[in-house]
Amino acid sequence: MTANTVITVATTQSPDAKPIAVSKTLTTNFTPLITVPSFEIPELVFGGSTVLAPGIAEVISPLIISNKTANTVYIDVQVFRLYDYSADPPIDVTSTFSLATNIPIPGYDTLPFPLNGQFFYNGDVLEAKSNVNDAIDVTISYTIGQAEEFLED
């Protein structure tokens, strides 16, 4: 996925909290684990136009990291933020922030990386990579829905 791109989901009603589970095998390139879309929904007015509503994802589990090899492998976890919603009105950020760098995962071990309760907004991407291809499996669960308080024109 290219940076500065927000996927838009056209729907008649966006979800409040659709549960999603993701399991992926990491490579030496950053692999997207959570990508948050916007929702194109009907505007409740005469004439039937649509409006863009930003999406939001809430992490409900730790990132489970499992090493399938006998050797210690290292992983990095980062988030790409498109907007800063702590500002009013939201401002463009388009920056990548490291959450963890070179976490050692011992051979045949499984570790939880706590992300429970973290929020990601439309355009945000949570990514992870390993220093060895196909040695690490990761699993994370989250809910995705519409961030109603941040309606866009």
Predicted feature descriptions by range:
Residues 62, 66-88, 130, 142-143:
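Short acidic, flexible loop segments centered on an aromatic residue
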Residues 2-56, 68, 122, 129-153:
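C-terminal interaction-tip segments
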Residues 83-125:
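Intrinsically disordered, low-complexity Pro/Gly/Ser/Thr-rich segments with frequent PxxP/GP/PP motifs
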